[in-house]
């Protein structure tokens, strides 16, 4: 019986952020596999090394820098015709030394929003999404008063929120569109992105569409035809089956919930961090932990393989 277990080559890679937020990329030599394409710097983990040790060594050898601060970002498994790789990606937010191509390779700094315009090896594309997403995602509560809602949203944007899921299930279609347009304009003025949850019509100016777990199983036309190039697709998931369905339809990122008990459903069954980590491990896109989350849980979510946390109450109230 043939062996179907894939042997992945463990490779570490870095999303290196400068003080201005730009990201450092290296260009692969023309004579190498995927030559000429841009990549996130890194290399193979050697026997006996931890991923962080391997990353630190590779970045010093390739770029002449010493890693001072790094945290896990995403793991991506990809099978090329030449072999399979596990990309163990870390976000480097502090380093010493001046980055340069010690092996003669071109290196350059790019704005995060420039990354989708560049050519990368196929395994790198989920990393681009992760690099463009923040660690916090605000899901808006049901709007009661439009003016108060926008004032509160502005306060959260001023506090640093850069990803918003606009949710307004009780508004009429016209009121939804009007308030969503105002929210998008406001968010964009802060450089933030807005995903629309169950909009009556998809808005061109929105940054993407967020699906409920029920909509995951809808006809494809519901979630594909409204999207223009560059708009994201995300989804709410509650178990491995739904997360796999999200992968099958090509979401860019997802929420997995409930991770911890919530104030709204204190006695409900929750997944816990162990299940979160094991489930996230099965997919190649960023996943936010949702349910009982506040900012103190970001580090735990990242260590568990997640992008960060999504929340309504705690992020709306500024916890």
Regions found by a protein language model. Name each.
Residues 22-62, 73-74:
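Conserved Nudix-box catalytic region and its N-terminal flanking loop in Nudix hydrolases
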């Amino acid at each position: 019986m043939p062996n179907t277990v894939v042997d992945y080559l463990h490779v570490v890679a870095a999303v290196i952020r400068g003080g201005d937020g730009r990201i450092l990329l290296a260009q692969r030599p023309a004579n190498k596999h995927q030559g000429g394409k841009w990549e996130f710097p890194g290399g193979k983990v050697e026997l006996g090394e931890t991923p962080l040790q391997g990353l630190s060594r590779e970045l010093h050898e390739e770029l002449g820098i010493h890693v001072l601060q790094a945290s896990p970002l995403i793991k991506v498994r990809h099978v090329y015709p030449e072999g399979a790789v596990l990309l163990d990606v870390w976000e480097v937010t502090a380093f010493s030394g001046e980055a340069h191509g010690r092996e003669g390779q071109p290196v350059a700094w790019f704005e995060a929003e420039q990354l989708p315009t560049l050519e990368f090896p196929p395994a790198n594309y989920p990393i681009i999404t992760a690099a463009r997403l923040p660690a916090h995602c605000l899901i808006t509560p049901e709007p009661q008063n439009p003016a108060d809602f926008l004032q509160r949203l502005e306060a959260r944007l001023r506090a640093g929120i850069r990803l918003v899921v606009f949710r307004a299930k009780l508004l009429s279609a016209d009121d939804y569109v009007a308030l969503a347009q105002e929210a998008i304009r406001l968010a964009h003025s802060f450089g933030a992105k807005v995903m629309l949850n169950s909009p009556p019509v998809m808005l061109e100016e929105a940054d993407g569409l967020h699906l409920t777990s029920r909509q995951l199983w809808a006809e494809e036309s519901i979630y594909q035809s409204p999207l223009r190039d560059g708009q994201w697709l995300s989804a709410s998931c509650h178990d491995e089956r739904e997360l796999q369905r999200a992968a099958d339809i090509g979401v860019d990122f997802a929420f997995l919930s409930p991770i911890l008990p919530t104030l709204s459903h204190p006695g409900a069954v929750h997944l816990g961090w162990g299940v979160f980590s094991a489930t996230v491990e099965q997919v190649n896109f960023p996943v936010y932990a949702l349910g009982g989350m506040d900012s103190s849980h970001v580090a735990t979510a990242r260590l568990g393989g997640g992008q960060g946390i999504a929340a309504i109450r705690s992020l709306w109230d500024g916890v």
